[in-house]
Amino acid sequence: MGSSRGIRRKVAVAASAILMVSGLSACSSGSAEGGTLTFLTFAESFTHADPQRNYTGQDLAWFSSFMHRTLTSYKRAPGAEGSELVADLATDLGTATNDFKTWEFTLRDGVTFEDGSPITCQDIRYGISRTYATDVITDGPTYAISMLDIPKDADGNSVYKGPYKTDGNDTAALDKAINCSEDGKTITFNLSRSVADFNYTLTYLSFGPVPQAKDTGDQYDLAPVSSGPYKIEKYAPKDEMVLVRNENWSKDSDPIRNAYPDKIVVRFGIAEEVRDQIILSDSEPNAMSLDGILPTNLTTVFNDDGTVKAEWEGRAHNVYDPYVTYSAVNVSKVNCLPIRKAIYYARDFGSILQIAGGQAFGGDPADGVIKPLMGLDYKKVTGLEDFKMEGNPEKAKALMDEAKKTCPDVYAKATGKGLVFDTVDSDTNKKAATVWIDSLKKNAGINLKFNFIEAGSYYAVVLDRTKQGDISRAGWAPDWANASTVVPELFLEEGGFPMSQVGKDPAYPEFEKRAKANLLEADRAKQGAEWAALNQYVMDNMWVIPGLFTKSQDMWGSNLEGVFFWEPQGAPSFGDIKLKS
């Protein structure tokens, strides 16, 4: 799961207990339903509102709280309890047979779309079918393609091409893989391999229902149909989104969601300092920032050790989130291992971390893409002992000397016109860019040119192979408590977030063979050890420049309560926020 904050991405470690510095906001006896809840963001839009295209943790948390339902979900609760799997559209967590290759679910009674029409198995199958239209429905997770028992053609592509193509499209294969009962109440998934935690996969909005008659292809992103407690009244990117109550939603058929405010407004394009000052001054006590807090304002809310100041108790938190940040090196363009390593050793990471607020707020230096909270999937990476927080120019220059001999073309590019570095357009990232540029030039002779991209458009750009630069900032967290949702997703060519573009790297065939074999490994301990070994393999080839095991800060107005950090989505549980008065 990718991060949409600054630039971090995906779902939390389901078994971890995230440290919450401030705790759960207390509920007052006078709180009631009603009023308008406001969210503020510097982004010009959500990354995606279309459920099949939604793959950033905060957006998953937001839309799954207010609009989009799935067969299963996570319990709305703080701490480790929030990682408990619960039934949503389904009556239970499913029945697995055939060595976990067949999964059956029954839909609850009374579940409907916003127009009152019933949600059926066919609607869920149609929603999932959109994932296969990879030329139209972009940026979302691809678990359906990798897990469902739909044959591949000679080129390794699915014989089913999605709902928008007719010629040569094997629709019967979809119907066999997702079988619906005659009454539309029972849905059976037939998988190509054993997946013991498939019911966790179904928490993703990409497995949610879409009414075929309302599907508008890529334009569905602007007006998706709701199955949750709210529906869209207005969505105007660069302006605002307004949600109002869905009169056809019933708490009786949706026991896991709340519907406290009458209206929810998201204001886009708010300058970062203006956004922060609205919350800091409490000029809008019903408002919450969606972007965290500028590093320059952290000491107003928190003590130097990261704890919440007394006057901000109940209005802010500073938590370890599930994300790992990194800079994906586009190996198809920077196909020179010594240069990739030189970038890692040359950067002044200490200064970059200070811009992010230091370790009390930014987090801890990462050694790969798997966080220690993953337990048996994590093992400390070796071979990085020459890393220095301030940069290691001696090591970096030696690597550049090697690159000059072994890959002169890439060396000439890096030291000449330079490498293009994609990142989100924000004040903090612009400050960090200066450090990157100066330290790589000084310590390795590498020239960098930054490509600053508007936040709401960022992933659409960097996941487009024709538009991505040489290096791209990103962040990821496991989709559930298994690094099968990290390593393959980030580095297999068919993964959901393959920004490193490693398919033509000489080291890729071995990685591909081992990763695909490990997806089939039934012994969880052996599987975890191999994910840790493949994390080491990734770092041996420096397919990413590791960043941080991150922390997140949120703050909100004085009239809000019920705010807590929701572990599995790495974001607040937005649907539990209410107005005090």
Question: Whereabouts are the PLM-identified features?
Answer:
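Surface-exposed binding/hinge segments that line
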Residues: 106, 123-125, 130-211, 236
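Long beta-strand-rich cores associated with HINT superfamily self-processing modules
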Residues: 554-581
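Periplasmic binding protein-like
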Residues: 37-40, 116, 279-286, 439-498, ...
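N-terminal lobe/hinge region of extracytoplasmic solute-binding protein
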Residues: 40-98, 225
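Ligand-site clamp/hinge motif
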Residues: 213-224, 249-304
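Gly/Pro-rich hinge or "lid" segments in bacterial periplasmic/extracellular proteins
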Residues: 76-80, 158, 191-259, 263
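Structural transition elements
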Residues: 230, 363-405, 425-431
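Extracytoplasmic/peripheral linker and loop segments enriched in polar/acidic and small residues
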Residues: 180, 353, 388-389, 446-460, ...
